[in-house]
Amino acid sequence: MKRISIVIPCYNSEATIRKVVEMVMEEFKKMDGYDCEFVLVNDGSPKDDTYGEIKKLGEQYKNVKGINLLRNFGQHNALMAALHYTEGDFILGMDDDMQTHPSQISKLIHKMEEGYDLSLIHI
């Protein structure tokens, strides 16, 4: 079974991140031969308890890891921090607000399996 590491920078995402994670998990249930892990990075969210929600997800699901950056370093730095904790065969970056809908994941993985180093979906 191949493992896909889903890395998601999170900023003021307390109200949205659970839905994103659980929708992605539902998509993986439809795909044979794959499982996933999540590396969620709170990028210093000042307005809500994003990291608290990430910790709850980590307690509920064994495939969820959380990182807490003490201040906002920006999306790219949050992604780089996440990469140090991935263990998957492939890495898939997503946004915390579903700019790439979880239903598109199978298309991205298919392209990665074809050998592409970078896969993008234009919606």
Question: PLM features: what roles do these ranges have?
Answer:
Residues 3-5, 37:
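Cell-envelope/extracellular polymer assembly enzymes that use nucleotide-activated donors
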Residues 13-29:
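Short, well-formed alpha-helical segments that are part of the catalytic scaffolds
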Residues 32-45, 67-68:
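Short beta-strand/loop segment that forms part of the nucleotide-sugar
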Residues 42-51, 98:
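A conserved acidic beta->alpha catalytic loop
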Residues 52, 69-86, 106-107:
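Glycine-rich, basic loop-to-helix element that forms the pyrophosphate-binding segment
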Residues 91:
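Short aromatic/hydrophobic "clamp" motif used to bind/position activated sugar donors
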Residues 105-118:
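Conserved donor-nucleotide/metal-binding helix-loop-beta segment in metal-dependent transferases, i.e.
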Residues 121-123:
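Conserved small/polar residues in nucleotide/adenosyl-binding loops
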